[in-house]
């Protein structure tokens, strides 16, 4: 089998990672992370080309005059703990981005002047099976009625609430930490599992755009002083980001959909950068998916509001992004395949092996990697 043929096999994306290198907590100080720098192109074994740096060195390491594009979505306290009518415990995770829920919201006049309802999608977990038509009760007056069962625990539901739904989730919900973080969410996660530039009106992600967690106000100021332009997109990170690729031939994988917003100012910034030959540096795979997804749908980056299900794996081309700042990803994950599409599978896995050997911290609260 040639390396090119191996690119399409799920088992080609395995690597060994000691459990103790999966970061369970953020670093003591935001931005106090390590940064592994790898050229996008080069030998199959990139170890001699790697640079081991600190995230604080980022302004010296980014491509000069780059346009930086980041995802400004905010993680919603989307995990609710409540009770069934039988008294049994139940957990609900809202999967539909909050702005879409609000677009669908209709007054529930039978329940009062400030009562609303809307259909949405979510995950329901409990000790037994949940019946269609069953209503579940949660804090802050949120009620969830199961309308239809779907695959992998998904449910179509009707939400009912009073007043401001975002405030209700904030009052009673929990931060939905990834499954590889083996602890309950704590008070610290409310701030540390959000980027400093996450917008209140962009709440609805069920996972953080984790490459952005390293940025501090001081780093933003330093980048601005060095002349880097900053632009933002919104991609509401869905729970599908943790969904495994199930088939051995990855070309048959169907990617989850995520809701994207590219504002006019960002589309114009990308167009200016491309016209002037300036590189575009994406903060995280979610920003990559937003930019490349819109470019695939529209032929270029333009103002857009809608869904993307783009799946980037080796052999797929990149139309927009020239550099990626990203965390380290799970074995056999679609995000590892995206990075491999950008820098080559063998190079990426060799860099990961070096990161493991040197004790880098992995996944959401872990260290970062810059590929340029």
Question: Language-model segments: which ranges?
Answer:
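A cross-family signal for N-terminal binding/gating loops and helix N-caps
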Residues: 1-372
């Amino acid at each position: 089998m040639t390396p090119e043929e191996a690119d399409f096999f799920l088992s080609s994306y395995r690597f060994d990672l000691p459990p103790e290198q999966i970061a369970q907590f953020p670093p003591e100080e935001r931005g106090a992370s390590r940064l592994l720098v790898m050229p996008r192109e080069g030998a199959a074994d990139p170890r001699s080309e790697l640079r081991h740096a600190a995230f604080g060195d980022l302004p010296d390491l980014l491509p000069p005059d780059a346009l930086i594009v980041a995802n400004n979505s905010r993680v919603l306290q989307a995990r609710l703990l409540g009770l069934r009518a039988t008294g049994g415990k139940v957990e609900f995770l809202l999967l539909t981005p909050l702005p879409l829920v609000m677009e669908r919201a209709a007054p529930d006049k039978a329940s009062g002047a400030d009562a609303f309802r809307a259909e949405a999608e979510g995950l329901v977990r409990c000790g037994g099976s949940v019946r269609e038509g069953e209503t579940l009760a949660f804090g802050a007056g949120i009620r969830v009625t199961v309308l239809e069962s779907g695959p992998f625990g998904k449910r179509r539901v009707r939400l009912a609430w009073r007043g401001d739904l975002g405030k209700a989730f904030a009052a009673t919900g929990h931060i939905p930490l990834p499954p590889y973080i083996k602890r309950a969410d704590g008070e610290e996660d409310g701030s540390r599992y959000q980027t400093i530039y996450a917008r209140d009106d962009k709440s609805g992600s069920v996972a953080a755009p984790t490459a952005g967690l390293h940025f501090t106000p001081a780093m933003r100021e330093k980048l601005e002083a060095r002349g880097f332009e900053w632009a933002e997109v919104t991609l509401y990170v869905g729970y599908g980001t943790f969904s495994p690729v199930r088939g051995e031939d990855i070309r048959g994988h169907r990617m989850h959909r995520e809701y994207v917003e590219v504002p006019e100012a960002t589309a114009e910034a990308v167009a200016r950068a491309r016209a002037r030959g300036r590189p575009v540096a994406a903060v995280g795979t979610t920003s990559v998916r937003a930019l490349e997804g819109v470019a695939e749908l529209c032929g270029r980056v333009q103002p857009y509001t809608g869904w993307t299900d783009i799946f980037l794996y080796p052999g797929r081309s990149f139309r927009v992004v020239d550099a990626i700042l990203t965390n380290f990803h799970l074995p056999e994950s679609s995000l590892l395949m995206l990075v491999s599409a950008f820098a080559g599978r063998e190079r990426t896995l060799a860099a990961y092996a070096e990161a493991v050997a040197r004790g880098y911290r992995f996944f959401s609260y872990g260290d970062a990697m810059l590929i340029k």
